[in-house]
UniProtKB/Swiss-Prot annotation:
NCBIfam families named among the record's database cross-references: dass
Compartment list: Cell membrane
Transmembrane parts of this sequence: 13-33, 54-74, 81-101, 120-140, 170-190, 211-231, 256-276, 286-306, 314-334, 349-369, 377-397, 399-419, 439-459
Protein name per the record: Uncharacterized transporter HI_0608
Principal location class: membrane
Topology of the protein relative to the lipid bilayer: Multi-pass membrane protein
Family: Belongs to the SLC13A/DASS transporter (TC 2.A.47) family. NADC subfamily.
Superkingdom of this protein's organism: Bacteria
Length: 461
C-alpha cells in the first residue's frame, strides 16, 4: 500500500508540474485579449486538476479565487462572493435534515417499517429496498444511504446460498448502489451537481422537481428491469425478517414533524413565500426563500436538541460546499473575462447546424462516460457554465444543456471507483467488476438516450 501511495503521489506531482507549465504557456501564446487569455489559462489549469484529481478537488476549488485575484480578473470580494451563494446554504440545510434523520435513526425506522410490509416475500422486499434507497437519497447523501441500506440487504441475502444464488446477490447489491445514484437526481439537495445547475440558473427547490423527479421516476424501473434481464435473480423465495427495534420517543416524533414541514415548505415555496412575505409586511417576496428555510431547519434542529451542532458539523461535507463556491467563482470569471464565449464559439463552430437531439445525445454521452473516471461534482462545476454559454451561442434554451450535464453527472454505473455507492457494494466482495461493467455500460447507454430524449422534448424547445 505504501508503494502504491508513493507512486500515486509521484504521478500527481508530475501532473501538477506539467499543469503549471501548460498554464504559463497558454497565458503567453493564446491569441485573444489578455483578460480572455488569463481566463482560458485558469480554466485549463483548474480543469486538469479537477479531472485528474492530482490535488484534492476541494483544494483545487480554493485555488480558483486565489488565482483569479492574482491574475487581476476579479477583486477579492468578487472572488469570494460565490462561497456565500444561497444554494450553498440550501445544501447545508439538506445536510442538517439528513443529520437529524440519521441521529434519530428515522432513516432505519422508515426502512424497517416499509420492509416489514413485505412479510418475508423476497420479491416485494427487494422492490421496497430499491424504492426506500431512492427516496432516502433524495434527502440524504447517496453515500450515507447506500452505506445504511447495505447491511439491511445483506441481512436478507444471508439467508440465501452465496454460490447458488450469486446472481440474486448481484441484482440486489447493484440495485441498491444504482437506486442511491438515481434517487439523488430527484431533489435539488439530493446530489451536488443538481445544486450546481440550480445555482447557475437560479432554480428553486420546486423548480428542480419538474426536471429531476421525472428522470428519476423513468430511470428507476428501467434500471430494475435491466438488472433483472441480465442477472435473472431468484426472487420467488421467502425469508425470515429480523429488524432492529427502534421505538418512538419525543425527539423522533419531533423529527417526524420537522422533516415533512421543511420538505413541503420547499416544494410549495411558490405559494408559501408570498403568504409569509405578506404576513411580515414586506413589499416583495423573500429572495432565495429556499435557503432561508434551510437555515431555519438547521436552527430548529439544533435548538430543539434533535441533533447537536457537533453532529451537524461532522455530517456536513464541507468540501462539497467549498467546491460549489469554487465552481461559481470560476463560472463568473469565465463569463466576465470573455473566456466562456471564446470557448463556446469554438465548440459551436464544430456542432453548429446539427440537430438539437443529436447535440443532446453527444453531450449526454460525453458527461456520463466522463464521470466514470472523474468526480461528478467537479465535472459539473467545470462544465455547467461552459455548456450554458454553448447553448446561448447555439440559440438553445440555456437550461437544456445545463440539465443534461447536471443530471448526466450522476449516471456513472460502470466502475467501482465512479461513485461511492458503487464502491460500497463492490466492497461487499459479492460483486465482480466485470459484472458491474457489463450492466453499467448498458445502463449508461439507456441513460444517454433517456436524458437526451427528455432534454429534446422538454428542455431544448
Amino acid at each position: 500500500m505504501g508503494e502504491m501511495a508513493s507512486l500515486r503521489s509521484h504521478k500527481n506531482g508530475i501532473i501538477f508540474i506539467l499543469d503549471i507549465v501548460l498554464f504559463f504557456v497558454l497565458l503567453n501564446v493564446l491569441p485573444f485579449e489578455p483578460k480572455a487569455n488569463s481566463g482560458l489559462a485558469l480554466l485549463a489549469f483548474i480543469a486538469v486538476l479537477w479531472l485528474s484529481e492530482a490535488l484534492h478537488v476541494t483544494i483545487t476549488a480554493l485555488l480558483v479565487p486565489l488565482l483569479a485575484v492574482a491574475l487581476g480578473l476579479v477583486s477579492t470580494k468578487q472572488a469570494l462572493v460565490g462561497f456565500a451563494d444561497p444554494t450553498i446554504f440550501l445544501f447545508f440545510g439538506g445536510f442538517s435534515l439528513a443529520t437529524a434523520l440519521h441521529i434519530q435513526k428515522l432513516d432505519k425506522l422508515i426502512a424497517n417499517k416499509i420492509m416489514a410490509l413485505a412479510r418475508g416475500n423476497l420479491f416485494i422486499a427487494v422492490i421496497y429496498l430499491f424504492l426506500i434507497t431512492a427516496f432516502l437519497s433524495m434527502w440524504m447523501s447517496n453515500t450515507a444511504t447506500a452505506a445504511m441500506m447495505l447491511p439491511l440487504a445483506m441481512g436478507i441475502l444471508s439467508q440465501l446460498d452465496r454460490e447458488k444464488d450469486h446472481n440474486t446477490y448481484v441484482f440486489v447489491l447493484l440495485g441498491i448502489a444504482y437506486s442511491a445514484s438515481i434517487g439523488g437526481m430527484g431533489t435539488l439537495v439530493g446530489s451536488p451537481p443538481n445544486a450546481i445547475v440550480a445555482s447557475n440558473l437560479n432554480l428553486t427547490f420546486s423548480d428542480w422537481l419538474w426536471y429531476g423527479l421525472p428522470i428519476m421516476i423513468i430511470l428507476l424501473p428501467l434500471m430494475i428491469g435491466i438488472l433483472y434481464i441480465i442477472f435473472k435473480p431468484k426472487l420467488h423465495l421467502n425469508f425470515e425478517q429480523t429488524f432492529e427495534n427502534i421505538e418512538m420517543n419525543p425527539m423522533r416524533i419531533l423529527t417526524f414533524i420537522i422533516f415533512p414541514v421543511i420538505a413541503l415548505t420547499w416544494i410549495f415555496s411558490g405559494k408559501i413565500n408570498p403568504f409569509i412575505s405578506g404576513l411580515l409586511g414586506l413589499q416583495k417576496n423573500i429572495a432565495s426563500f429556499d435557503s432561508i428555510v434551510a437555515l431555519l431547519a438547521a436552527i430548529v434542529i439544533c435548538s430543539t436538541g434533535v441533533a447537536s451542532w457537533k453532529q451537524i458539523q461532522s455530517n456536513t461535507d464541507w468540501g462539497v460546499l467549498m467546491l460549489f463556491g469554487g465552481g461559481l467563482t470560476l463560472s463568473a470569471v469565465l463569463k466576465d473575462s470573455g473566456a466562456s464565449k471564446i470557448l463556446a464559439d469554438s465548440i459551436v463552430f464544430m456542432i453548429d447546424g446539427q440537430h438539437f437531439y443529436l447535440i443532446g445525445l453527444l453531450v449526454a454521452a460525453f458527461i456520463i462516460f466522463l464521470t466514470e473516471f472523474t468526480s461528478n461534482t467537479a465535472s459539473a462545476a467545470l462544465l455547467v457554465p461552459i455548456f450554458i454559454s454553448i447553448a446561448q451561442s447555439l440559440g438553445m434554451p440555456e437550461i437544456g444543456l445545463a440539465l443534461i450535464i447536471g443530471i448526466g453527472a450522476s449516471c456513472a454505473f460502470m466502475l467501482p471507483v465512479a461513485t461511492p455507492p458503487n464502491a460500497i457494494v463492490f466492497g461487499s466482495g459479492q460483486v465482480k467488476q466485470s459484472e458491474m461493467v457489463k450492466v453499467g455500460f448498458l445502463l449508461n447507454l439507456v441513460c444517454v438516450v433517456v436524458i437526451a430524449t427528455m432534454g429534446y422534448m422538454f428542455w431544448l424547445k
